[in-house]
Amino acid sequence: MLRRWRTLVAGGLLGAGLWLSGCSAAPVAQESPAAASRPPEAGLDTPLLTRPGAARRYPPREGRRLERRGDFHVDHGVAARAFNERVRFLILHYTDGDDASALRALTGPEVSVHYLVLARPARWAGEPVVLQLLDERRRAWHAGVSQWGDRRHLNDTSIGIEIVNAGYRDTPHGRLWFPFAEDQIELVSRLARDIVQRYDIDPTHVLAHGDVAPGRKVDPGPFFPWRQLHEAGVGAWPRPADVTRWVHRFHRQPPDIGQLHRALAAWGYAVPDAPDAGALRPVVRAFQLHFRPTDTDGVIDTETAARLFALIERYQGRGQALKLLRE
């Protein structure tokens, strides 16, 4: 009995000693493997970095195909499939001057373009030569403040072609426009066809500078042969039979200003908020410069309206053209 009492007392004193020891100093925690692998707390200055295994080494044959950029290399051997092209529009301009003034302006600090077609393009091996001033991957400063459909700032998504041409001169007898040379149009057709094929540019996205900046720009003017360009496989143009049918319809019942306002917007033009004939005039003139160059006064007549709706029918469907008249 006495031995048992001594054992209990000794055990109690030992427990008390351990408890007192625990009060006077924090116990040493044993960190589990899972806790040791946790990421460091936010706010620590030193990030957690790991040391991976041995890096793959390129065989000499593969290594020679790598691109060197400064103090590292790039492997182009794996390609992503989910992407789209920067280029969605082709915009045509004239320079409003001669070769020398065009080159000065387009190689200066304020404006630029991807391609320049000279007044008399040089030839090599029987074929015309165009000047490429900027890589197509780069953003040229050629469209300025611009819009087509829901796209703004078309420098971001377009390739620009400048054609050397004097533009126009105002005279006491009216505005005098200067024509283009046949060899210029031959070269523009070949160049534009190459661009739209490589980037799969929609015909309705081959535009005049005046189309994307109505009222501010008029180039390439009424002498640019858009129909000829279309026949070369580039850009939009209405079918003559469709135009004739719409002319007959509008002779019986012409569209009102609201319907024309909606149709111009549906085609892609940036239109004013209110369907007002005066406010629409610069937009109508831009359309006429492209699709009805024999009459560019900005007034909507039967022929202009017929060409607009014929274009919508051809490229957006007859249902869409009729819907614009019902709304």
Model-derived regions, located:
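C-terminal motif of bacterial Sec signal peptides marking the signal peptidase cleavage site
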Residues: 20-22
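Short strand-loop junctions, especially beta-strand C-caps/beta-turns
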Residues: 164-166, 211, 272
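Active-site-adjacent loop/helix surface patches within enzyme catalytic domains
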Residues: 30-40, 45-202
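Bacterial N-terminal signal peptides that target proteins for export
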Residues: 1-12
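A short, structure-level motif marking secondary-structure boundaries and short turns
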Residues: 176-178, 210-211, 245-246
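Hydrophobic core
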Residues: 14-18
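Cell-envelope/ECM-targeting effectors and their regulatory/trafficking segments
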Residues: 24-29, 185, 189-199, 215-327
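Acidic/histidine-rich, metal-coordinating catalytic segments
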Residues: 201-216
